């Protein structure tokens, strides 16, 4: 019957899900607890560069709040 495919389908789904989740957790672990930022457009790249300059430590993910900007 049709339900005989469910175990195989669930195993395949889990196998496809694991790399995506692992990548997200690895990026979060290596970037100080924040998600990895991706710059698809030039404007987003400029924002990341601005955040890197403002933080003062050459890391875009160590950002300061607006109250700490001179």
Swiss-Prot record:
The keyword Transmembrane helix applies. It comes from Pan paniscus (Pygmy chimpanzee). Its main location: mitochondrion. Complex I is composed of 45 different subunits. It is found in: Mitochondrion inner membrane. InterPro entries: NADH_Ub_cplx-1_asu_su-1. Accessory subunit of the mitochondrial membrane respiratory chain NADH dehydrogenase (Complex I), that is believed not to be involved in catalysis. Complex I functions in the transfer of electrons from NADH to the respiratory chain. The immediate electron acceptor for the enzyme is believed to be ubiquinone. Belongs to the complex I NDUFA1 subunit family. One of its GO terms (cellular component) is respiratory chain complex I. It is a single-pass membrane protein. The chain crosses the membrane at residues 1-21. Keywords: Electron transport, Membrane, Mitochondrion, Mitochondrion inner membrane, Respiratory chain, Transmembrane, Transmembrane helix, Transport. This is NADH dehydrogenase [ubiquinone] 1 alpha subcomplex subunit 1.
